């Protein structure tokens, strides 16, 4: 886990028990291209946990009978699955090239990947051009399906709109008195969308509150003392941040000693990944999100119990939300493949049949129920959860946990996030 790869192609081939009348070696593996950060600042908190989740899923699925029903069949409808894992580091141009390589050289059947919203925006039209089913597992910008229609591109996890709408709802409900707010977000699609959604919702709920400062930083900047000084000097009551990965960890490390979290109520919409690595640095009262019902907010169901047990056998750190997003997306792929088979294990469904099976579907996962109800059936919605940190007997715990139903924090089909928020969530 400590090894860093600048460019890695790791292939894991695990054979499953064949269905009656067939030998495992006669079955052509179903190849899944997995794209996640294996190097750089996002690798530790995001990429490596996601990679572990993918490997755990492959091992358990190929063994057969390990997952709860209806996911207990070996492989994908009897076919063993093979992972081709590559590094997401390097920027959008590199990722477009890597996607073409996965399809044209590695001959993958589907692609599961991408944490960066910039990467998702770049690869989506290329995946459509290549007619390769591509499941976006973690990026959050709602623009993917609001600005284009896709036949082959899906996102079986929710957008960041619900993160930030729910953040504003949570602040409005739990902070009785506040007059000012500020933000520190990354200056690209993810951070811009997150800030606009949070501020727009907050202003619709409390039009009298005033912005003190909005700090937009370069992705991966690493040093935030100038921005922290600007925020502290503006003395806001509420601070919103959608920082993730290494940027999030840097903000916590640099902000906590300067009382950034003491002088205001701070809400970290993607803060859950930091609680395992920085539990002692996160002050009590910090509002934390996990980009859905993931990690510490995941429901008690058979799929979650399976996942936690299998993951913890492979890692010293509990699964965080990038791990949940990865396994949820792989659940979607298995669900769609086997639905497209229609119970005929000898059938090899086409890409188009698998895509049709996932469009508009509802399936179960370690994070609960997932509905593909936006983006003409290609975009998922889920509930959103927030809670406040509190140290109890030396351990970080959560209080004031509130769960928001999917329909309360996601726009209706046919309406963009911006339109919905501008219309006061109506």
Model-based region annotation:
Residues 1-31, 422-426:
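Short, low-complexity disordered leader/linker segments with a strong preference
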Residues 24-34, 73-80, 172-179:
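Immediate post-signal peptide segment of exported/extracytoplasmic ligand-binding proteins
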């Amino acid at each position: 886990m400590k090894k860093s790869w600048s460019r890695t192609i790791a292939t894991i081939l695990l054979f499953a028990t064949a269905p009656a009348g067939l030998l495992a070696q006669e079955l052509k593996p179903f190849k899944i291209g997995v794209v996640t950060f294996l190097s750089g600042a996002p690798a530790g908190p995001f990429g490596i946990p996601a990679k572990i989740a993918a490997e755990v899923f492959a091992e358990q699925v190929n063994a057969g009978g390990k997952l709860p029903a209806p996911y207990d069949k070996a492989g994908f409808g009897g076919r063993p699955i093979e992972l081709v894992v590559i590094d997401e580091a390097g920027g959008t141009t590199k990722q477009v090239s890597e996607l073409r390589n996965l399809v044209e050289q590695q001959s993958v059947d589907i692609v599961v990947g991408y944490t960066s919203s910039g990467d998702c925006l770049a690869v989506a039209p290329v995946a459509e051009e290549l007619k390769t089913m591509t499941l976006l597992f973690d990026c959050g910008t709602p623009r993917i399906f609001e600005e284009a229609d896709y036949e082959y591109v899906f996102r079986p996890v929710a957008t960041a709109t619900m993160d930030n709408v729910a953040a504003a709802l949570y602040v409005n409900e739990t902070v009785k008195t506040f007059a000012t707010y500020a933000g520190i977000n990354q200056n690209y699609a993810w951070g811009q969308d997150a800030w606009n959604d949070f501020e727009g919702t907050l202003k619709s709920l409390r039009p009298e509150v005033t912005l003190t400062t909005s700090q937009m930083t370069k992705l991966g900047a690493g040093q935030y003392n100038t921005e922290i000084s600007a925020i502290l000097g503006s003395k806001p009551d509420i601070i919103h941040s959608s920082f993730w990965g290494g940027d999030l960890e840097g903000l916590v490390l640099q902000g906590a000693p300067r009382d950034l979290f003491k002088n205001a109520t701070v809400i970290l919409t993607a803060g859950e990944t930091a609680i395992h690595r920085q539990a002692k640095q996160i002050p009590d009262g910090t509002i934390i999100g996990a980009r859905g019902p993931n990690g510490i907010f995941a429901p008690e169901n058979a799929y979650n119990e399976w996942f936690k047990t299998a993951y913890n056998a492979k890692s010293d750190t509990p699964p965080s939300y990038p791990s949940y997003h990865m396994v949820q997306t792989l659940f979607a792929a298995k669900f769609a493949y086997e639905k497209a088979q229609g119970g005929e294990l000898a059938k090899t469904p086409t890409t188009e049949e698998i895509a049709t099976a996932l469009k508009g579907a509802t399936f179960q996962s370690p994070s609960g129920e997932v509905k593909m109800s936006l983006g003409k059936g290609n975009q998922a919605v889920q509930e959103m959860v927030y809670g406040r940190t509190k140290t109890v007997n030396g351990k970080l715990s959560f209080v004031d946990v509130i769960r928001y139903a999917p329909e309360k924090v996601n726009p209706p089909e046919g309406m963009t996030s911006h339109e919905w928020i501008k219309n006061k969530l109506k």
